[in-house]
C-alpha cells in the first residue's frame, strides 16, 4: 500500500534535460548560466546579440550626438568613445592610463649649476667693416694724412692708425674700410667714424654706410693645466692637435660656430664670434670638458 501511494520526490516535475534539474525555471538573475550540475542548453547567443545590439545603438547615438556638437562648434569629430574601457592605447587616441615613464627627447647633458666656470672671457680684438661710399685716391690720403702709410707693392691699401681708441684701419681705393684693434663694440664704431672723418677732411665725399662687426676675439685662463692629448683623442671630430706645428689644440665648436685655441697652460682663445654672447656661450660649453681633462700632477 505504501508503494502504491508513495510518489518519488519531484516526480512529474522533472525536466527532460535531467532528473537533477527542476523543470520549473527557478534561475535567479544573480546566478550565471548553468549550475554546474547538468549541462544547460546554449541560451547565450540571443542574449549576447541583444546586448551587443543595444551597445551598438548606444554608441551610434553618442557618436551622432558628438558629431552634431562638433559640427556646430567647428571642431573635428572625435573617434574616442568614453564608454569603451580598455587599458591598451587606441590608435590615434591618448591612452587611458599613461605610462609612468614619460618619454623625453635626447639632449646634450646640461652642465650643473655648481660647475659654472665663474670666468668671463675678455675681448681682445674686434674687426669691423664700413663702406665710405666713394672712390678714394690712396696716394693723396697717404701724403696728406697723419699716421698713414701706403706701399702698393706690398699691400693695396692705406694703413692708418689713431691713438684713441687705439686702432688700425685699412682703407681701400674702392671706399671699403676695415677697422681692427678695438676692445669693445662701441670703440670699434667710434674709431671707424674717426677714420671716415679724416677722409672727409681730405676732400672726399665719404659717408658711413653698412657698419658691421665681422669678428670678435676673446681670451681667458682656466687656472689649471690641461691634458691636450686626451682631449684630442676624445673629441677627434671637433679638434686637431699638432704640437710640432702649433702648441695649441684647435677646437672647432659647432654651436655656436666658434674656434677655440686651447693651450696646455690653461689659456684659451676664442675667435669667430659676431656678437659678444657667442664667446660667453662657447666658453661655458667648453669649460666642463676642460675640467674633465685637468692635469693632476
Curated annotation (Swiss-Prot):
The N-terminal domain is extensively phosphorylated. Pfam families: TBP (PF00352). PROSITE patterns: TFIID. Residues 52-115 are annotated as: Disordered. The keyword Transmembrane does not apply. It comes from the Eukaryota. The keyword Nucleotidyltransferase does not apply. Residues 77-87 have a biased composition (Polar residues). Residues 56-76, 104-114 have a biased composition (Low complexity). One of its GO terms (molecular function) is RNA polymerase II general transcription initiation factor activity. Belongs to the TFIID complex together with the TBP-associated factors (TAFs). Binds DNA as monomer. General transcription factor that functions at the core of the DNA-binding multiprotein factor TFIID. Binding of TFIID to the TATA box is the initial transcriptional step of the pre-initiation complex (PIC), playing a role in the activation of eukaryotic genes transcribed by RNA polymerase II. Members of the TBP family are differentially required to regulate transcription and development during early embryogenesis. Binds to the promoters of select genes. This is TATA-box-binding protein.
